[in-house]
Amino acid sequence: MYFKNRDEAGRQIAEILFHPYGRSKTVILAIGTGGLLVGRPIALRLQIPLYMVATKEIDLPGSYHERVGTVDQAGDFVYSSNLTQGQVDDYVGEYHNHIEAEKIEAMHEINRMMGSTGFVDKAQLYEHNIILVSDGLKTAVDLDAVMAFLKPVKIFRMIGATPIASIDAIDRLHILTDEIRVLSPKENYLETDHYYEENNLPSDEEAMQMLEALGHNPYVEA
């Protein structure tokens, strides 16, 4: 399945989620700016708040760009669940300085993206359903980071929603969430942009303006 753009994909998901979650004690948590574009029509249709969580991926050096983990906006680092403990130990031993430098740079990028807009307290998520929205999940790295970020928060129900996901990511969603909504599972997942005709993602500033226009502060405080 292919989509004209992320807004169209979000509208399709919104119709699926409207009856169980419309106008309920539910919030949308979008992963990155791509997730924001998918989440916006869902929030408008369901008339529920939309927030965005910032994450930055950490890759190993070299041409193969092995993804080792993800930093969230609290500065917490989560190793990819795809890695074995032996791989983690090897990477830490060989690439410790690189990983630490990338963590620092990731936090600088997240702080620049946040700007002076401030945070929304995690209390905004307490005892709510959370619809976790991505524009596409090739791996579970971002999922693991966001779930670690949400671990202290008492929630009612976790729903994973995305237009596209690999089989591995879907398997991880089954473990991490109470309900999943994936429009198009992919056995051979290409890059996320491949599945959209239009790939005009907003800049960080445009993303902030988009969230503020919806009447919600953009970030959840870590």
Place the predicted regions along the sequence by residue.
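PRPP-associated nucleotide enzymes
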Residues: 1-222
